[in-house]
């Protein structure tokens, strides 16, 4: 073994000890996988991964995405040796207020690129980052090119999302994407061969990947594989590293305690191993398991100096490029800062009485010409979810050509959403992804991580109600609005509502809802109709100006001097309330109609504004095409809500409107009954 390799093995053993010690101290966690993966992460971080140690947010750094978040001790230990976590941080694993949570949460300044935990999502986010890198390089040059590395486990390969990642990365020929598969044949409750017998290498080769199989504990083989991955220009690379779970673990009698299912998800001592003997076997001090080896200090100090030299050279290249491309440099700065171009939303022409998905297409057409760093994706529905309003003015990504701004994800909603998260994590782009609202069920795990990570991803969900019609109940969302609006009640770690959910009521409001969506910093859902909706009336002269009040979450669209009742809805039901209000007015019953596109946004307004829109002491009536609970917080326990508490049926939507009572006559009758008239 060469001197360099022997030092790297010592570093890897240091990471094994630190990982096991962290879990022992926390009395919970996953030591075995971290001990098995230590060799690969050592070589990657000490010889290949390029970043600026003095500016961890350097935009053109290589990215490392950890998919199996339960292996966080391995990542934290490595980053601690690199100088980004303290010993105290490691000793606080999984404790209240620590910066080392059980599963990593995005913390770029310490080297954590992504929040991970739900298996499969991490490497799908890495795919998104790799696509974003190609998008940026296509516009500003290969001087900013960088690699995206993903670390996956057997569990991620088993997760269905791996199909989407494998297919898309291979199809697009993402040679900047390198994935390490830690194959140790162990998972939480079984050995892998008890649940999977497929040939993983052949599967990825069929998808068009460059597949390399190595001994994941052999420093030379790891290095050679990473060199080969760096030189690959046509395909993404999968390195299959065959490793040993609990590498170096010893039992009470000094016997090997490697390759055991029991060491996957609990401290070594709880699994039956001898922690002190394990530390000693790995060359450490059982009395001081958090000690940093001299070899680790030396290797990482040398790497830090090499990285600083690399960063200085990169800075010089960028400086020269900026001097020669001043206009492009300004655009790059706008991309990275999130600065948006000036857009006159009031001048966007909109036909009357359009479906809000069609209105969205019009806005996206404007964005395609104005917002150069927006990437729009669709899961094989662009001509139905109307994201084709964007596509018609650009083109989709293809292998070797990322000059367009559209990502055809194919039928893979969860993968698409995770890819959008990865794009947002990479930075410099605004990701948008569209599909039918009912298929948001496939996306919820990724939407949840969007909210947890506070990522600016825009979800366009169309065909928002039973008015999908003839396709029937499998395609008619009923409970979905209630589910996604719960995210407005769930607060993120910045004490904000973790998501903004907007269901605009007509074409003009859709325009202004899009304005909110692109100016946000959190994830946004736009829930849009399949069918045409009548343009709402105005209290003043210009509907578009009144629609701008969507920024307050809710506002009055039709009023009376002394309303006997307040009628509340979102989306297409607002127009139905207007129809009912006109019938009531003809009978001498004055009412107010309130449109609440986002209850969360509305509740964030001053109480005085909320009370001016929904005055106390006035009867309230609500209509929703979803579950009645959608409006319970606005209507109150004493009000009446017309909603659905059952699945839909297959029939033309106008027939369903009649059968389910979604018309002005029903509104008028139910309001009169509520008022005792």
Feature locations, PLM:
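Thiamine diphosphate
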Residues: 1-147, 298, 302-527, 532-533, ...
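Small/polar loops that bind or transfer phosphate-bearing groups
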Residues: 66-67, 153, 214, 378, ...
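DG-centered beta-turn motif at the end of beta-strands
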Residues: 128, 146-159
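Conserved beta-strand elements of the Class I
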Residues: 149, 375, 566-568
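Residue-level marker for buried hydrophobic side chains located in beta-strands
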Residues: 150-151, 179, 377, 621
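Active-site metal-binding loops of divalent metal-dependent hydrolases
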Residues: 153-156, 243, 381, 436, ...
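Non-catalytic, alpha-helical, charged scaffold/linker segments
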Residues: 278-312
């Amino acid at each position: 073994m060469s001197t360099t390799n022997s030092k790297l093995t010592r570093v890897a053993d240091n990471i094994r000890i630190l990982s096991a010690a962290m879990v022992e101290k926390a009395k919970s966690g996953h030591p075995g996988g971290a001990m098995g993966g230590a060799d690969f992460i050592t070589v990657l971080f000490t010889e290949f991964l390029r970043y600026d140690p003095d500016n961890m947010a350097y935009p053109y750094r290589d990215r490392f995405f950890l998919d199996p978040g339960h292996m966080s001790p391995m990542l934290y230990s490595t980053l601690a040796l690199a100088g980004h976590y303290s010993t105290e941080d490691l000793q606080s694993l999984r404790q209240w207020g620590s910066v080392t949570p059980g599963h990593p949460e995005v913390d770029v300044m310490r080297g954590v690129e992504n929040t991970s935990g739900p298996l499969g999502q991490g490497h799908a986010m890495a795919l998104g980052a790799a696509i974003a890198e190609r998008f940026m390089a296509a516009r500003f040059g290969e001087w900013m090119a960088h690699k995206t590395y993903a670390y996956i486990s057997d569990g991620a390969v088993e997760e269905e999302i791996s199909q989407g990642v494998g297919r898309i990365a291979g199809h697009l020929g993402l040679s900047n994407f390198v994935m390490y598969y830690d194959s140790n044949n162990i998972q939480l409750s079984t050995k892998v061969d008890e649940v999977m017998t497929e040939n993983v290498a052949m599967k990825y080769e069929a998808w068009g990947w460059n597949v390399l199989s190595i001994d994941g504990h052999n420093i030379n083989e790891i290095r050679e594989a990473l060199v080969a991955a760096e030189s690959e220009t046509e395909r993404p690379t999968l390195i299959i590293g065959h490793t040993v779970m609990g590498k170096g673990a010893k039992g009470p009698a000094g016997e090997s305690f490697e390759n055991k299912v029991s060491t996957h998800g609990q401290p070594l001592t709880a699994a039956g191993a001898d922690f002190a003997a394990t530390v000693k076997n790995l060359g450490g001090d059982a009395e001081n398991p958090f000690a940093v080896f001299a070899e680790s200090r030396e290797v990482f100090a040398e790497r830090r100096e090499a990285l600083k030299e690399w960063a200085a050279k990169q800075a010089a290249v960028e400086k020269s490029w900026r001097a020669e491309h001043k206009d492009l440099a300004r655009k790059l700065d706008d991309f990275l800062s999130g600065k948006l171009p000036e857009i006159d939303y009031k001048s966007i022409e909109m036909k009357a009485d359009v479906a809000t998905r069609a209105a969205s297409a019009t806005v996206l057409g404007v964005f395609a010409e104005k917002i150069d760093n927006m990437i729009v994706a669709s899961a094989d529905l662009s001509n139905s979810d109307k994201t084709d309003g964007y596509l018609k003015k650009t083109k989709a990504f293809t292998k070797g050509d990322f000059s367009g701004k559209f990502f055809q994800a194919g039928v893979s909603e969860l993968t698409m959403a995770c890819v959008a998260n990865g794009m947002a994590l990479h930075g410099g782009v605004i990701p948008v992804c569209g599909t039918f609202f009912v298929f948001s069920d496939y996306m919820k795990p990724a939407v949840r991580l969007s909210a947890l990570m506070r990522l600016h991803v825009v979800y366009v969900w169309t065909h928002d109600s039973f008015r999908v019609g003839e396709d029937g109940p499998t395609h008619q969302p009923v409970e979905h609005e209630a589910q996604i609006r719960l995210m407005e009640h769930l607060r993120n770690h910045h004490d904000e509502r973790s998501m903004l959910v907007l269901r605009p009521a007509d074409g003009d409001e859709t325009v202004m809802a899009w304005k909110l969506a692109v100016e946000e910093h959190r994830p946004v859902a736009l829930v849009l109709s399949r069918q045409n909706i009548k343009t709402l009336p105005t209290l003043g002269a210009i509907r578009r100006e009144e629609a701008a009040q969507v920024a307050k979450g809710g506002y009055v669209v039709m009023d009376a001097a002394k309303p006997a009742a307040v009628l509340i809805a979102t989306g297409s039901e607002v127009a139905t309330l207007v129809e009912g209000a006109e019938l009531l007015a003809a009978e001498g019953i004055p009412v107010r109609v309130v449109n609440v596109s986002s209850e969360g946004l509305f509740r964030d307004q001053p109480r005085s504004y909320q009370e001016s829109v929904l005055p106390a002491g006035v009867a309230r009536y609500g209509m929703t095409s979803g579950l009645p609970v959608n409006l319970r917080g606005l209507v109150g326990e004493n009000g009446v809500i017309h909603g659905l508490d059952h699945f839909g049926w297959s029939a033309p939507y106008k027939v369903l409107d009649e059968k389910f009572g979604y018309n002005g006559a029903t509104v008028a009758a139910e309001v009169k009954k509520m008022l005792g008239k």
